[in-house]
């Protein structure tokens, strides 16, 4: 009888079941740990069940990481750049219905630059930059290594023609204040 019991699901099996593949799942786990380590959040969750949000139109949004502060919630998406544009647009539209700040984390800067940045730009074009600006939408994009250094590679503020590229920002606010 004891041999007929199903074995306990290990972490790897659970992550693959919940996130489709190990790379995406373990990157979510790493992103959550980086966000916990900042000390900015009361809670950080990667629970698909706990993070599920049913939208008014009946669609479901399940952010990869949900971070709670005392008076706000932030939603983070880990992206490997494998979505078709229509699926990515759908994901962004769901997110913008629950938050004004869309946070995307990629595996590396190459994926941020060559996969996610173009997808974000196409989504912005499909919605209309002015409409997103009026809605107060801002999109943040970075790699996991830049997130660990607490910086965003790109910020799409819907005001400027191009996203703000933090990587190329050489200004130093301390020096500016002293001059």
Regions found by a protein language model. Name each.
Residues 1-33, 178-179:
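Interdomain/boundary linker segments immediately adjacent to catalytic/signaling cores
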Residues 3, 12-15, 53, 120, ...:
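Extended hydrophobic/Leu-rich segments
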Residues 4, 11-14, 66, 73-75, ...:
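Ordered hydrophobic segments in well-structured contexts
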Residues 18-23, 32, 36-87:
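Active-site metal-binding core of divalent-cation-utilizing nuclease and nuclease-like domains
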Residues 26, 83, 111:
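Short alpha-helical
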Residues 86-107, 111-179:
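Non-catalytic C-terminal interaction segments of nucleic acid-processing enzymes
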């Amino acid at each position: 009888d004891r041999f007929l019991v199903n074995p306990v699901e290990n972490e790897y099996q659970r992550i693959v079941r919940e996130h489709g593949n190990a790379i995406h799942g373990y990157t979510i786990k790493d992103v959550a740990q980086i966000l916990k380590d900042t000390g900015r959040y009361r809670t950080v969750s990667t629970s698909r069940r706990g993070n599920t949000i049913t939208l008014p139109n009946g669609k479901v949004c399940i952010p990869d990481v949900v971070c709670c502060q005392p008076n706000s919630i932030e939603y983070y998406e880990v992206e490997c750049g494998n979505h078709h544009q229509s699926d990515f647009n759908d994901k962004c539209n769901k997110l913008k219905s629950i938050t004004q700040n869309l946070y995307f984390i990629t595996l590396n800067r190459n994926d941020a630059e060559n996969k996610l940045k173009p997808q974000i730009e196409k989504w912005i074009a499909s919605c209309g930059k002015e409409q997103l600006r009026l809605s107060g939408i801002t999109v943040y994009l970075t790699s996991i290594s830049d997130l660990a250094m607490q910086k965003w590679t790109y910020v799409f503020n819907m005001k400027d023609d191009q996203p703000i590229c933090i990587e190329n920002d050489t200004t130093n606010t301390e020096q500016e204040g002293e001059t």
